[in-house]
């Protein structure tokens, strides 16, 4: 591409001059600087022929522009203008450029587009763009005027994504995932009990000493000598560790970017068998998680603490389980902002609280060493994020592009419909191996994740931005096994995967349990 421009000189009419004819081919670009006062570069052709083609490009200089600015005679000639540029463009995403062709000259017209009204904007770009437009005026002064003057030079609408803070919404999915992982440690203990790994009362047949029916009258004389029933363990203490990773795709029309997060942590708890059909327990744990939204140059960390209680009631082959958990997170975020003046780094720190619970019902069907259990569950969580303001820096100086975030409440409400397949193999000496496979369809009724923010140093109204959402529908698969070493010790492990059109997540968990 051949480009004709002269950025090293002051704006002035006629600063390009050709004494001969002027011809621009289809591959050529005539790039002329223009400013908000009407000054512009221009070309004077003294020859007898002007042949136009290619691109006429307006290179927008810093300043506050009105709706329309006309630049007269950006190309003038003593000859006639009988051809046209193939295209007329602007270096800024927020201007449309057109040309007017006269007998001996070409004029350039620059029309400013509202920050929230540019063709092709996403939902998020329109949201912050409309807020910025409401605060714009050619009469602005000081730092606000400088901000808008630099913004108007941006060559891509992506600058609005950089300003929006959209990537910080990644704290929400990350917090929900950490809470779910803690809940799965409690769920695992209830599942172990439901599947029958807790020991039981021994019968005569189990002892192998005599038939269940007496063989003669003398048998009654020895009835009192029957082996006593083995007491079922009533207490469990357990500890578990977990780790997980998730990838979620963004939404192009909304304007959200892809999110990835990682989490690891552990929990410990104790439960009590109130009666042969009722289990009650409590647990506490901690987690550490990170997230990254690469396309928004945003990352963060969440340090969480969790406490919860759980219960399961059996009604013959039916069961009902419930759990409730509270989590507190210390959140930190970091993002890099480019495209408006000097690159800035913005950091935020805030606390958040989460309350969640799960209710599940199911019925087991026994097929010898295998049981099949259809089940349905609902899992609700509410996350409250505190308000906070970023501290931004531009090199060693304070920044001007940081955001102030409003307090936010976000809900997750997935439901589960599926089946559990539990095996059971006894090896003797109270050692039992129990492999299992659980499969479910998961539907999330509240997948949206949003933030509401405003610029700290620029007086504009708040705007709401949507981040990467949770998947509305996904398939979940659990694979694992439990090994009861004897009546007092059990180890277990499982891996879980969720798969959807937006991405996938994987988690792993291991646990050790002592019973007495």
Report the location of each language-model feature.
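Extracellular/surface-exposed low-complexity segments
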Residues: 29, 33-35, 54-173
